[in-house]
Amino acid sequence: MARATFDMNAAGLEARGGGHTEHGPLPFSVESLLEAERVPGSESGELGVERPLGASKPGAWPPPVAHSCPPRAPSPPPCTLRKHKTNRKPRTPFTTAQLLALERKFHQKQYLSIAERAEFSSSLSLTETQVKIWFQNRRAKAKRLQEAELEKLKLAAKPLLPAAFALPFPLGTQLHSSAATFGGNAVPGILAGPVAAYGMYYLS
């Protein structure tokens, strides 16, 4: 009785399944995992090819290109021009009264002795070094002015005509020699008048 019931159940299952039974792979079986890892192919039906991990996906941005910086131009050599000294002492600002006293003293005497310089600097509330340097600069200025005046005198003393047009001897000597050569006759040109007058004065 039990065997007949089992046969009927088996026959019913076969009738429902079309005469045979198929069982699909379980969701956690090895076949299902392998099917999930496969990559679908392209539209032409080709199977997908597995790409390495570092490969870029289709349609992604290309990797940035590293731009090499241009070489820097060499720095110019340091300037070798002579620079003014920064530790130079500032010029002494003399007052108007001090300058007038220094000028009067310079016109009296251009060179001061040590005692005179000490006394004079003390009267002006200046140091001996300041008075000494002022007299040195004033003497140099006086020398430049004197040389400029001499140059002006030399330029003023030069003749207006060049040396080629200067007469080698006085005009009277030339006229006397011309009259003696031609026997008192008049010479054509500019010598006619003076020679004739000279001859008439000599004959009278």
Curated annotation (Swiss-Prot):
Region of interest (Disordered), ranges: 39-89
Keyword Zinc among record annotations: no
Pro residues bias: start-end ranges: 60-79
Chief subcellular location: nucleus
Matching SUPFAM superfamilies: Homeodomain-like
Source species, domain of life: Eukaryota
This protein's UniProt keywords: Developmental protein, DNA-binding, Homeobox, Nucleus, Repressor, Transcription, Transcription regulation
Keyword Transcription annotated: yes
Disulfide bonds: none
Entries under PANTHER family matching the protein: HOMEOBOX PROTEIN MSX, HOMEOBOX PROTEIN MSX-3
Name of the protein in its database record: Homeobox protein MSX-3
Organism: Mus musculus
UniProt gene name: Msx3
